[in-house]
Amino acid sequence: MWPAYFVVAPGRKRVPSLLLSTAARDPWKPYPVPRFEPFAAIRYATDDLASLVAPPYDVLSDADIDVLKARSPHNIVRIDVPRGGEDRYVLAAKTMRAWLNDGILTMDSEPSFTVYRMRFTDSTGVRRDIAGVLGGLEVVDAEAGGVLPHERTTAAASTDRLDLTRATAANLSPVWGLSLAGGLTELLAEPGEAVGAVIDEGVEHLAERVTDQERIAAIHQRLASDDVLIADGHHRYGVARMYRDETREATGRSDTPAELTLAFVNELIEDQLSVAAIHRLYTGIEIADLADALGRSFELIATERPNSKSLATLQQEGFLILVGRDAAWQMRAKPGRFDGVRPLDGGWLETALADIPLTVSYQHGLDATLSEVDSGHASAAVLIRPVSVAEIERTAREGLLMPPKSTFFRPKLKTGFVIRSLT
């Protein structure tokens, strides 16, 4: 097992943290940073993966799953999103074993890291080349530090992911982490051995295996020098913690593969992140009442319903947009109303509507959000601005938490490039 490191990064500010504990922490005390280790990956035997990989399970509709299953009898959704009754997890595990026995899936003969690149043009016309690394990220206790959430999470109502992990004894889809260690992007610039490429919806996804021991050590040591912030996959990481605890109780050991979980980690810097907003949908309240409630905290100016171009312009000017079926308003915070509140649209809305009886849900994408309002599924929506990368870094550095569903990281990682065995 690779060694663990305990450091305080130069210039790192440690403060009492709403994130980790209500108790004050010694700002000069060294806290553990997580291990990040290579492993012998399970991969498809072919590098022609277009019909085999899939988006993450939590963004797939039933129709999406049908389309993916129709592409190939070996598409990863047949394991990652099993259908059926109570035996569906057992069937998923049997399918995975059968694919391994039949050579559809193969396990590498030695531990490796996998460099994962996503190349695309974002919604602003900027060319992006996001480079991260797939490996085994240490599963730490909720208050231990090292692996940090960046937003409050809603309670998971289903045990689906834990049941699937128990049955398959595998990590099927990665957590997305952001490393606060500088220089990771430069370290990943050199290509590795190509093991798969897919182009989907304008995004080129590439996977490259790294087995060179010096390069593995360099990546490991760089990631061992600072914290990792969870960008996407808070629930998956929580499931990994539950599975680790079950394994410890069953085996009496703390050195099994369950001590780590599959993660993609890239550097927390501006050119390595593409962050979109997750808009707010409101039900249980009439649009007039919602406008009245928001009008106590925001200046509301009647406007036309925005399109993608006008929304971007309004957001750059500092506006949020309240949208109903037949009306829309520009919203600008009243002077002094949110003094002492972090400059996050989601937090401002929570503060403004704290005493108003309503239900809030979340939707990314302008068209999908407006569709929810037009269909009557929501009374109204508030279109919010994307969170800045600087504010995400502040969240990590100061041990803070954003409101739920504050960030939507794009593009979504594909499931199926790499599977990590837990046996």
Label each PLM-derived region with a short phrase.
Residues L18-T423:
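Surface-exposed, charge/polar-rich loops and edge strands
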Residues R14:
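Cationic, low-complexity basic patches in intrinsically disordered or flexible, solvent-exposed regions
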